[in-house]
Amino acid sequence: MIEFIPLEYYTKFYYFIVLFVVFITFINSKVAFLQDRNNLKNLSLVGFLLLFFILIYMGLRPVSGKYFGDTSTYSFIFNDYKTDNIQSRDNVEYSFRFLLQICSKIMGVNAFFFVCAILYVMPLYYASKKIFNQYWFLAFIMLVTSMSFWSYGTNGIRNGLATSFFIYGLTKSTLRTQLIWFVIAFGFHKSVTLPILGFLLTLKFNTPRGFLIFWFSCIPFSLLIGSSFQNLISGVFEDDRLNSYFYNTTQLSEFSKIGFRWDFLAYSATGVFAGWYFIVKRKFEDKFYTKIYSIYVFANACWILVIKSAFSNRFAYLSWFMLGLIIVYPFLKQQFFKNQYAVLGTILGAYFTFTFILEVIIGYR
């Protein structure tokens, strides 16, 4: 466990390290050619160093509820399994329950969180490697610089595990294998039902135009009757955790504000615009990209319907975890700009700057 860094600076230290890596990548994009073999080797080396740092730094963090949210809650649940206390066993989904059962028998709580970090980060690495081959680092860094990445590796751990397995499942070549991984993802957190539903819809309706119309329609709908929609959803599901996301206002200083989050909407719109620009404006034809873009737009539109809820960021995460892929994918698959690597470097810099300002400088939660 890493104890030499004060807890109050632990998360900020992570962002400063990532800032340094982003800065190096930004400079590299201005002075080097992406296709150069030596440059690709250097980028891969930086990527592996970043991967190693994240695994160690996230996985060996101290157990603290004050600074890492639900980390302390999961430590209590783990200790219940360790001591055969059955009180917590019916409160977690089957994949996470299986993980707890195995880990509690052979390791301590700190090692358990390290395993969680591996299961959270490595699927993103493997997915980046599978989709982008030698350019994997640029996709990976877009994923780990997302505004929600650190939070869902240290706070909403089950959500993070579920979405990482979902992304990994998307890379599989057969529908059967994809669905198997989606079932595993669902077993970590039921909220991943939303992107899974989006995936199933794309099997029949993989046309971005329809999803875009739905996305834009949800904005005025949410402004006018969003609260009524929240009441309807909470009544249908009758889930205490879901209802607390809608109505709990006792911990707003630690989470998000209530009200229509125009800042979150603007952040989400970057992905909506990116996909529209490449698919519609630049006529980029790629079935996989069209699919993940449609899933993103669908999940984000559903979040807009409940954007006024107390924990709006947790619903937004069900689309935000794909945002980095939506932005970077076309850049690594087809030539669109004269100095495309330099353009991508600028976008990466702007993308992480937004995250850095919100998380480190002002703190959006």
Residues of each region from the PLM?
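Membrane-interface transmembrane helices that cradle and orient dolichyl/undecaprenyl
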Residues: G160, F166-T177
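Membrane-interface alpha helices of multi-pass inner-membrane proteins
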Residues: T177-L201, I304
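Alpha-helical transmembrane segments and terminal signal-anchor/GPI-anchor hydrophobic tails
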Residues: Y67-F76, R97, G198-R314, E359-R365
